[in-house]
């Protein structure tokens, strides 16, 4: 395990308990784990980039070998090189995720052949959870307890109290 540094990336819009499970498990496999928060150019964000980063930082604060890094734009492999990462960490919930990730891995390997990609299977109980489903629940003010970290719940409650559009 010595010298192994992982990078787990996503838009985390918002961070879910599925993401947190991946981050916690990766923190046991690597000396250090960076969690890179990106904007997805193919999606309209629900939460601002700053709020997503804040909620993610609060969610991982108890994990001493995990650091959140903001990389609003760019490629994960570029951030990985900048941070001297040895492994990209990807989570898989189902075969659709696998097909998508296999395509990404091909290009990541072409751009950075020295950085390995590893896949962690999602915990069975967390497989149905996705940020897009959470956003739907939030939009309808449905309960999200047990699906997301407390930092997300706190932010949603705060915004609901102020009747702000998220």
From Swiss-Prot:
Its EC number is 2.7.7.3. It holds the Pfam family CTP_transf_like. Transmembrane segments: none annotated. Its main location: cytoplasm. InterPro entries: Cyt_trans-like, PPAT, Rossmann-like_a/b/a_fold. It comes from the Bacteria. GO terms for molecular function: ATP binding; pantetheine-phosphate adenylyltransferase activity. Homohexamer. This is Phosphopantetheine adenylyltransferase. It comes from Streptococcus equi subsp. zooepidemicus (strain MGCS10565). The gene is coaD.
